[in-house]
From Swiss-Prot:
The active site is at 149 (proton acceptor). This is UDP-glucose 4-epimerase. Its EC number is 5.1.3.2. Belongs to the NAD(P)-dependent epimerase/dehydratase family. Homodimer. The keyword Isomerase applies.
Length: 338
């Protein structure tokens, strides 16, 4: 039996493939390569010595989904596919909804037709909006989102919850990520955004490698210890391992299940800059600019539920996040483009 990984050539997807293959799972990947590269799948093979079966296509395409389910014995789906960056999605709400929401509906419909009853969904802490309670637990209010990306994730969560009620055989696991950073320790796979990065760590590392002249710090007047936004940063390998734990716990475990995946510790933008400088001996020039629409002051998790119910907790600290980020970037200054 195989696991279908949508968006498997992307940043989190490729790291999850490595961990799945290390456990000898059979993997099928569907990715449209709109914000990823097939080179990442070649690198995954270099790391693990194992291949995945790859289909290039879109989750909106029912024909390719039916082909995948017909040609492979799929028992579960890990669903990463969708537009990711807060910045890009604020400019085109319709495209965000079409890809992230409609695509997820199509995927789940075709899963159910094929009698595939387990899905692990890549959600986000952005569903909490501007949280009134810190640290954030899973029972905190959701839906007061501040950008289209968060809204799309919230909508898919609600759709999955309602689908479980309509199709009680379905096991839907929602993983609410906090801010993923770092790269595989080999330096072969990592985050490779198109254009100017929207996320902090690739922005920092591209300044370090000389691709960008300075870091833009979005907002210096938040109510935090240094005026910059505070987030919960989690190593991407720890995040990947959380998917394996969720899948093992809830395979064919009918119901709707929600977990935060974070460290439980918040760091500011300037904390992260200083940590990168200390870990790698590189100075990062920066300039404080206007706040980015949709950003909030503070967001970090209470990850106890994942520890208690999944047996999952983070193992990689801030220094390793910084070293692994730089190891990836310095060895791949142009990402997967050569």
């Amino acid at each position: 039996m195989a696991i279908l990984v949508t968006g498997g050539a992307g940043y989190i997807g490729s790291h999850t493939l490595v961990e799945l293959l290390n456990e000898n799972r059979e993997i099928v990947v569907l990715d449209n390569l709109s914000n990823s590269s097939e080179v990442s799948l070649e690198r995954v093979k270099q790391i693990t010595g194992k291949s995945v079966k790859f289909y290039q296509g879109d989750i909106l395409d029912r024909d390719i989904l039916r082909k995948i389910f017909a040609e492979n014995q799929i028992e579960s789906v890990i669903h990463f596919a969708g537009l990711k960056a807060v910045g890009e999605t604020s400019e085109n709400r319709y495209v965000t909804i079409k890809n992230n929401v409609t695509g997820s509906i199509v995927l789940v419909e075709e899963m159910l037709k094929a009698n595939v009853n387990t899905i692990v969904f890549s959600s986000s802490a952005t569903v909490y909006g501007d949280p009134q309670i810190i640290p954030i637990v899973e029972s905190c209010p959701v839906g007061g989102t501040t950008n289209p990306y968060g809204t799309s994730k919230y909508m898919v969560e609600r759709i999955l919850e309602d689908t479980v009620k309509a199709f009680p055989q379905l096991s839907a696991v929602v993983l609410r990520y906090f801010n993923r950073v770092g790269a595989h320790e080999s330096g072969l796979i990592g985050e490779d955004p198109n254009g100017i990065p929207n996320n902090l760590m690739p922005f920092i590392s591209q300044v370090a490698v000389g691709k960008l002249p300075q870091l833009s710090v979005f907002g210096g007047d938040y109510n935090t210890h240094d005026g910059t936004g505070v987030r919960d940063y989690i190593h991407v390998v720890d995040l990947a391992l959380g998917h394996l734990k969720a899948l093992d716990k809830h395979q064919n475990d009918a119901g709707f299940h929600v977990y935060n995946l974070g460290t439980g510790t918040g760091y500011s933008v300037l904390d992260m800059v200083k940590a990168f400088e200390a870990a790698n001996g590189i100075t990062i020039p920066y300039k404080v600019v206007d706040r980015r629409p949709g950003d909030i002051a503070v967001c970090y998790s209470a990850p106890q539920k994942a520890l208690e119910q999944l047996g999952w907790e983070t193992e990689r600290g801030l220094e390793q996040m910084m070293k692994d980020t730089w190891n990836w970037q310095k060895n791949n200054p142009n990402g997967y483009k050569g």
